[in-house]
Each structure stands twice: as C-alpha cells, then as structure tokens.
C-alpha cells in the first residue's frame, strides 16, 4: 500500500539525512494523531466492536496481548462486551504521551506503531511504512481505519517545521 504526498517546499538541495529527518517528523505527526484517536482526515476512529468475542489462547491476538478479565473457557476467553472490553481490560494504558486518552488509538501491544518506520530515503524522496512483522495486519488496519497519511492541516504544519529547521523562518 502506497500513499504519496506532495509538499510545497521552497526549492532546496536536500541531503539524504535531511530527507530522513523530514520523514521522521511525519512519523511523529502521524503517531501523535493516532494516540489522540484520529484518522488522517482528523476524524475520530470508529469505536471498537461491542459484539461478544472469544480470544483463543492460540490466536495471534492472544500472542500480542494476553487477555485478562474475561470469562475463562477451555480454549479461549470470552469478552461479552466485545473487542472494546478485551482491549480495555487487557492492556496497561500508558498516558506517557500527552493526549493518549482515546479508546481507539490502534495500540494493543505497541508492535504495529513500533514497526511504522522510515523504510527508505534519498535526497529527493522517502518512503514510510510498516516492517514485515506487522505489514499484513497493519495495512489491513489502515484500510479499515485510515491512519497512514496526513491531513492538509498536518501537511501545512510539516511545511512550517521544515522551513523553520532549514531556513530559520
């Protein structure tokens, strides 16, 4: 999955390290927005399901975050309140990042966002995306919840950051 965006920057001769730094700024903007529970259109993420769910002890969901607080079954744990209940009861919420209060912030084990990185960079372009351990899952989540990308307001914010860092404006 590829997202392309154009930045209206002054004509500059940029180096690979500078382009990598710009890509890191974009990652930071996106991650902060995700922790606030917003997609790339700055809309709140759709709420997690309240439909009853069984988390199998052999599932990848179980491996990412061991279920806690549900009703124990022989091969699984039942959460009558759905995925929303599973997530709320099972994870240890960290509010270390200011504004990380959203119920839907795409953070379960943290593995997906830890693997959301700068994949490649040259002096003219860069690619951000997900590393192999989470690619399939992460890009599926992105199709459903749209987190990879920037809103116009964020693009404008990024342009101002780049201008300030490179031109001292």
Predicted regions and their residues:
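Short, Lys/Arg-rich flexible segments
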Residues: 1-169
């Amino acid at each position: 999955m590829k997202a392309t965006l154009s930045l209206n920057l002054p004509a500059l001769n940029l180096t690979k390290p500078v382009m990598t730094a710009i890509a890191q700024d974009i990652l930071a903007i996106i991650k902060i927005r995700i922790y606030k529970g917003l997609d790339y259109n700055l809309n709140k993420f759709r709420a997690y399901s309240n439909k009853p769910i069984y988390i199998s002890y052999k599932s990848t969901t179980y491996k990412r975050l061991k279920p806690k607080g549900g009703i124990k079954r022989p091969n699984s744990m039942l959460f009558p309140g759905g995925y929303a209940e599973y997530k709320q009861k099972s994870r240890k919420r960290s509010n270390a990042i200011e504004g990380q209060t959203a119920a839907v912030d795409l953070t379960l084990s943290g593995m997906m966002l830890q693997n959301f990185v700068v994949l490649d960079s040259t002096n003219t372009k860069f690619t951000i995306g997900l590393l192999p351990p989470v690619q399939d899952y992460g890009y599926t989540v992105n199709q459903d919840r749209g987190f990879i990308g920037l809103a116009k307001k964020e693009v404008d914010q990024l342009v101002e950051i780049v201008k300030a860092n490179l031109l001292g404006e």
